[in-house]
């Protein structure tokens, strides 16, 4: 009912490989983290490179209580031996992020996500929060991507799984305009 789709390990590893290879300290955002497969893949990629980084942080959001228990276990194992501090939030990402966007907080250098896919009611609290944050959208996936973009620091990188439906049609025109105003698309993988 939450619109969640889990990311298989090979896809998570591919997504993690898409980040630039040269960066120092980082703060990763994983919105709708599920069991943590995307963040775990990101951290695994860090372990298997020559690059060094002084420290990192990972902020993971998971609303589902059962999923959050698995997430905590997986992330504790994934950060072992790495100078990475995890922050796991059991809260509504849209509520949390829209407040940060309103206060112009740009906290993250990296974002990796497989957002939930579900329509947003035109009269819902989520829709009102998003409008207040300057985001007009009809689906959770576009809301999560737009909020994540808004929370990236200048020069930050977002890697996300999103359906190609955003590419056409009137419903997603505001989302397309938002992407083009606030980011540069460097790579599409179909």
Question: What is each PLM-predicted segment?
Answer:
Residues 126-134:
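Short alpha-helical oligomerization interface
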Residues 55-56, 156:
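A short helix->loop->beta-strand "cap" motif at the edges of active sites that frequently abuts
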Residues 22-23, 102-106:
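Glycine-rich phosphate-binding loop signature in dinucleotide/nucleotide-binding domains
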Residues 37, 63, 67-70, 137-190:
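Conserved Class I SAM-dependent methyltransferase catalytic core
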Residues 1-51, 59-78, 97, 115, ...:
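Class I S-adenosyl-L-methionine
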Residues 57, 85-87, 184-187:
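Conserved beta-strand segments of alpha/beta enzyme cores
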Residues 15, 28-43, 64, 92-96, ...:
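Conserved proline-anchored active-site loop of SAM-dependent methyltransferases
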Residues 82-93:
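Conserved SAM-binding strand-loop segment of SAM-dependent methyltransferases
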């Amino acid at each position: 009912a939450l619109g969640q789709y889990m990311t298989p390990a090979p896809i998570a590893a591919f997504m993690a490989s898409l980040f630039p290879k040269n960066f120092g300290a980082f703060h990763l955002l994983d919105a709708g983290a599920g069991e943590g497969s995307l963040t775990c893949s990101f951290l695994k990629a860090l372990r298997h490179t020559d690059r060094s980084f002084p420290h990192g942080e990972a902020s993971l959001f998971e609303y589902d209580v059962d999923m959050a228990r698995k997430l905590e276990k997986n992330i504790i194992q994934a950060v072992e031996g790495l100078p990475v501090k995890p922050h796991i939030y059991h809260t509504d990402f849209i509520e949390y992020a829209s407040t940060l966007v309103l206060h112009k907080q740009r906290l993250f250098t990296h974002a990796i996500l497989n957002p939930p896919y579900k329509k947003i009611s035109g009269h819902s609290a989520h829709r009102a929060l998003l409008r207040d944050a300057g985001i007009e959208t009809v689906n959770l996936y576009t809301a999560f991507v737009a909020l994540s973009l808004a929370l990236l620091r200048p020069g930050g990188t977002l890697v996300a799984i999103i359906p190609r439906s955003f590419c056409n049609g009137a419903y997603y025109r505001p989302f397309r305009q938002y992407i083009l105003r606030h980011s540069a698309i460097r790579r599409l993988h179909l």
